[in-house]
Structure formats: structure tokens, C-alpha cells
């Protein structure tokens, strides 16, 4: 069931600071009933994004965590239209546009789209959608896109930290390194994986997320994540 859930999730370009409160956003066309599909929360920007489905339309709402301000409230017939607007809002709000910072005028970076289930927060991401197997050894991308700080995602309720980097930095003969850390114990990672292909990296990340959803990394207190999600949801406007 968890494997099916991960495989059906819609991958998204996401930036630093967003926490996934709820994620049932997939590409299925057969939804008939009213349902919530996605809730993202950004503590730094004091905002959340909610995606829902009702009356045969997708709805996206961008609102403040203080409950008294709705910034965007739009509806779309097709999921492709929704995804375009959703990624724009993720990056626009994440860049600080709600606080009077310069509006997002540049193109959204070509970051790797990820399937992130509920409970995880993106601490930082610079991971590009660039397959190292397609690059020449002299390509400048090795200098700018392949370093030790590509992705860090944390699951605070379960004290998990997922870290991705390229080792050695900028080396065409290197590899992706994936580590899953619990309770800040870097000496004894729960996962320590190396791979050289982008598609393999994606598969490994999906597998780790699937195992987390099945509580395979948690020795006790399997309900912690649910109670944390409930607490986060209480802050939101429905």
C-alpha cells in the first residue's frame, strides 16, 4: 500500500522551508468526491498552500498561517494547469513574495521533482534534474551542480534526516551518496547508499520514503507522526 502511494504521488519542484502536512496529490483522473489533496506549510513565510478537489475542479489556496489573509484562491479543470500554478506558488511564496520581497520574475530552477510524503520538511535543496551519465567530463555542470550539499530533508517527529550529496565534489567519476540519519547519529546511518544514475537516486529516495511510511525506521511510538500532523493542521484555515 505504501509502495503504491509513493508511486502514484505527483512529483513536485519544491524549495527550502516547506513542510508537507498532507500529500495525496496524484495524477488519477477518476476523483469524484470532495477531498483534500495537498497541504504545504512554510513557517518562515507564515503561509500555507492547500490543494483540494471539488465539483470536478482542482482548487488551490494560498493563505497566511494567522488565519486572516487569503492571497490566492483559484480553480482549474486540468491537473496540468494546477501543477503549473502550484509550483509557481511554491517558489513565489518560498522566495518571500508575501513579505514584500522581489516577486519571482525568473524561471523556476531546474531542480529535481520529488515525491515527498507527509511529515517531511525540506531544509535545503540544490539537486538539479541533470543525469550525470549525460554530461561530458568537461561540462561546467560538474562544478556547479554536483557538490556535497544537494538535498537535506528532515522528519522532525521521527528524528530522521535524509541527506544527499555528490562525492567527491565535482568529480565526473564520483557518485551520489544517500544517508538516512536518526537522532543525529551520523556514525551509524540507517541507510548509506551510493549510486551513479539519476533514475537510481530517485528510486532509492522513493524506497526510503516508503519504508518511513511503514514505520520501519522507528523503534517505538509509531503514532508520533500522526499526532504531529494533527498539530500542524490545527494551524491551517480550512
Q: Which stretches of residues belong to each language-model region?
A:
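Negatively charged, low-complexity tracts enriched in Asp/Glu with abundant Ser/Thr
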Residues: 1-46, 66-77, 96-157
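Hydrophobic beta-strand residues in large extracellular and virion-surface proteins
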Residues: 20, 40, 49-51, 60, ...
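Short beta-strand segments
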Residues: 47-49, 160-162, 191
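Short beta-strand micro-motifs enriched in acidic
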Residues: 50-54, 156, 165-169
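Coil-to-beta-strand transition motifs
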Residues: 57, 159, 171-173
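Mixed-charge, Lys/Arg-enriched low-complexity segments
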Residues: 61-113, 174-238
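Residue-level detector of short, conserved catalytic/binding motifs and their immediate flanks
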Residues: 149-151, 162, 176
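Residues in well-ordered beta-strands of folded domains
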Residues: 154, 165, 179-181
Amino acid at each position: 500500500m505504501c509502495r503504491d502511494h509513493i508511486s502514484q504521488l505527483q512529483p513536485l519542484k519544491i524549495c527550502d522551508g516547506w513542510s508537507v502536512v498532507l500529500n495525496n496529490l496524484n495524477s488519477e483522473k477518476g476523483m469524484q468526491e470532495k477531498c483534500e489533496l495537498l497541504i504545504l506549510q512554510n513557517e518562515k513565510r507564515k503561509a500555507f498552500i492547500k490543494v483540494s478537489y471539488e465539483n470536478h475542479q482542482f482548487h488551490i489556496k494560498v493563505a497566511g498561517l494567522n488565519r486572516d489573509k487569503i492571497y490566492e484562491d483559484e480553480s482549474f479543470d486540468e491537473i496540468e494547469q494546477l501543477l503549473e500554478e502550484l509550483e509557481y506558488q511554491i517558489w513565489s511564496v518560498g522566495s518571500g513574495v508575501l513579505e514584500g520581497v522581489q516577486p519571482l520574475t525568473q524561471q523556476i530552477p531546474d531542480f529535481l521533482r520529488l515525491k515527498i510524503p507527509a511529515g517531511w520538511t525540506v531544509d535545503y535543496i540544490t539537486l538539479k534534474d541533470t543525469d550525470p551519465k549525460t554530461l561530458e567530463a568537461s561540462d561546467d555542470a560538474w562544478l556547479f551542480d554536483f557538490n556535497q550539499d544537494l538535498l537535506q530533508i528532515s522528519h522532525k517527529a521521527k528524528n530522521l534526516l535524509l541527506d544527499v550529496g555528490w562525492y567527491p565534489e565535482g568529480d565526473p567519476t564520483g557518485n551520489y551518496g544517500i544517508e538516512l540519519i536518526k537522532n543525529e547519529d551520523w556514525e551509524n546511518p540507517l541507510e548509506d547508499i551510493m549510486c551513479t544514475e539519476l533514475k537510481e537516486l530517485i528510486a532509492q529516495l522513493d524506497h526510503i520514503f516508503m519504508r518511513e511510511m511503514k514505520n520501519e525506521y522507528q523503534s517505538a511510538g509509531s503514532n508520533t507522526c500522526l499526532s504531529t500532523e494533527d498539530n500542524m493542521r490545527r494551524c491551517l484555515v480550512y
